Design a protein with these regions (language model features):
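Post-transcriptional modification and biogenesis factors for structured RNAs
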Residues: 1-100
Length: 100
């Protein structure tokens, strides 16, 4: 069974996001194991230090064998079909764990 890790900084506070996440976890859990991993926000006053520390905390929670898919508001947008194809291609090549 494939394993998806959703790794994020801080807790999801918005009720609508919590509800959507719960719905997707319920739907997908028939096909994949899903873990949601929340690392604490860093309180450093300097943004670059905060990003560095949070990045280190995220990386500590990701297995070396995991395929990392970075999700970024400013990143390349892909369709659900393309994401599914990407995951399928990786799975065929032996990858069973993905971290988002």
């Amino acid at each position: 069974m494939m394993h998806f890790n959703i790794v994020c900084v801080g807790k999801i506070k918005e009720a609508y996001l919590q509800s959507a996440i719960a719905d997707y976890v319920t739907r997908l859990s028939k096909y994949v194991k899903i873990d949601i991993i929340e690392v604490p926000e860093d309180n450093s006053p300097q943004m670059d230090k905060r990003i560095e520390k949070e990045g280190e905390m995220l990386m500590k929670r990701i297995s070396a064998s995991s395929c990392v898919v970075a999700l970024d508001l400013h990143g390349k947008e892909i369709s659900s079909e393309k994401l599914a194809s990407f995951i399928s291609d990786k799975a065929v090549s032996g990858v069973s764990e993905f971290s988002f």
